[in-house]
Amino acid sequence: MADMKTGIFAKNVQKRLNRAQEKVLQKLGKADETKDEQFEEYVQNFKRQEAEGSRLQRELRAYLAAIKGMQDASKKLTESLHEVYEPDWYGREDVKMIGEKCDELWEDFHQKLVDGSLLTLDTYLGQFPDIKTRIAKRSRKLVDYDSARHHLEALQSSKRKDEGRITKAEEEFQKAQKVFEEFNTDLQEELPSLWSRRVGFYVNTFKNVSSLEAKFHKEIALLCHKLYEVMTKLGDQHADKAFTIQGAPSDSGPLRIAKTPSPPEEVSPLPSPTASPNHMLAPASPAPARPKSPTQLRKGPPVPPLPKLTPTKELQQENIINLFDDNFVPEINVTTPSQNEIPETKKVESLLDLDFDPFKPEVVSTGVTHSPMSQTLPWDLWTTTSELVQPASSTAFNGFAQDTTAFAVQSNENVTETLTEAEEAPLGELKVEETPTAAVVEKEAILAEPDEPTEQAAESIEAGDKETTGIAEKESEVVSAAGGAVAVEDSVVVAAGAGEGAVRTEQEAAAEGDKPQGEEKDVDVSQEKVSSIPSVVIEPASNNEGEGEEHHVIMNESKDAAAEMGTQGTDSETSQIGSEQKATEEIQTTPSQDQPASAGDTASDMPPGFLFKVEVLHDFEAANSDELNLKRGDIVLVIPSETTADQEAGWLTGIKESEWLQYRDANSYKGLFPENFTRHLE
């Protein structure tokens, strides 16, 4: 018995050695290898089929586990409802019965899925291990076949032929070939059949799953409807104890889409900077989202973001000294465009109250003054451009005169004399220059009667604003007069003590001497109504980008301020319009000559039906062919819209100025764009 076991063991070891030797020879290329490419393809399909079936089995078990979890959760939910149900409430027994039936449905659904799908899938996958074993055994028999064949060939090709050994080798070769052919034939028939049957198995499995799930949902929907009816009757029984949630959506009808844009919640403007700190940071809002096109029931365009506000760091040396005083009380009186002004109150502040950020970069002063009207502009005209808000020119801070005008060319001696006179003069005796007031009255006339000469005068004023710096180096007298006009364009806010702060030329003194004394008093009184002394000026946080847009924003603000202030004027101020307008036109004659075209020529070059210009504040990407692709800083010429629905929804029709100047075709290049992505220029 022991000898028999030893013989079998030795025989198996010999087979393993022969197979290993044959594989080594085949790897080294010293022995050829029998290959069946078609069978190898069958093996690859078998491996793929086994992997797909294993994954399907794994996911189906996870699905069944989820069903079991839903069964437990549903059971606990109905049990908790039954526990809180009062005995005198309607449908107590019905609720209990519905819960029990729901649990039975979940259990039946789970069991049928296990019997009809999971067990079938397990049976389907059960045949793969056996086939896999037979494939491995066939591979070993193929090696034995190659080994026997090589051994027989070696004996037949040897010089010394041994017929006995050759005969024995032939018998072994035939035996190995027979065993290999048996495995190979069976697998050649079974593997393709198994691969083709996978389609029918998938169909039957998922048909069973879908039918069971549909039946389950249909039956449990009836129970849910019964529970809904019980709850409805319970609510009718206790109608006086109804519980409503404010703001909860109702299912009484479809949702209504509003076409008009809803403005954001505006922060109420501060009555005065002393009422609350004027150096607080405004909350930043995200970039506006792209609105929908008008063909898709577009709503109003979104709200542009609010500008960030930071305190200015450009304080004079005298102001810094006063800040460290224990009794530092800044007298702030910011004039708003509204007529109902709230009387200012004084608030004791210290340097610790100011929110200075030492990590913000220093901003170079540009000499441009913003009107405080920009703090109370409507929400759809706010911008996030890097326009700098500087202290008002020719203003006084705590009684000390400041000269911040960048357009007047003065020597060091003149500046010293001016500061000395401002310090010695009493605050009540200081007068305001008449040039800003006259320019404001002139703007009132321009808004009231927009004829062609007046528009040319406005174009001349804008041209003078751009070229005053270059002319100031050549003709100081013309520069001084133009600086007064530019001060009006830059800001409507004029300090009460700013009149003596600027050096007047001989021409201005002569012009003032010709005016009646009564008119001069009226101008002083009306100018004092809008004067202010801002001590802490806020500016938008920026990186000095978009400074080229300053001029347009300032012109827009000053025109709005002039329209508000013009209603408070007297008849005596209106009588000065003619003389002041002529003086302004004479002052601006030199820079206006350099303009390439007049306002009349520009109007003739506009597209048909031109209304006004707007500047794009945010990038807008068109979603439809009837919309414009806009980038920040583009100028758009607005023309009448074809439908009023677009205007009501907050959309405008226009053509980009660059495309109009290049193609002169409004019909081909016009398109829609959101109005609150832009601001008006004229």
Swiss-Prot record:
Residues 261-274 have a biased composition (Pro residues). One of its GO terms (biological process) is synaptic vesicle endocytosis. Is abundant in the forebrain and cerebellum. It is also found in the adrenal gland, anterior and posterior pituitary. Residues 244-310, 446-470, 501-530, 561-606 are annotated as: Disordered. It is a peripheral membrane protein. Transmembrane segments: none annotated. PROSITE patterns: BAR, SH3. One of its GO terms (molecular function) is phospholipid binding. Residues 24-240 form the BAR domain. May participate in mechanisms of regulated exocytosis in synapses and certain endocrine cell types. May control the properties of the membrane associated cytoskeleton. This is Amphiphysin. The lineage of its organism: Eukaryota, Metazoa, Chordata, Craniata, Vertebrata. The gene is AMPH.
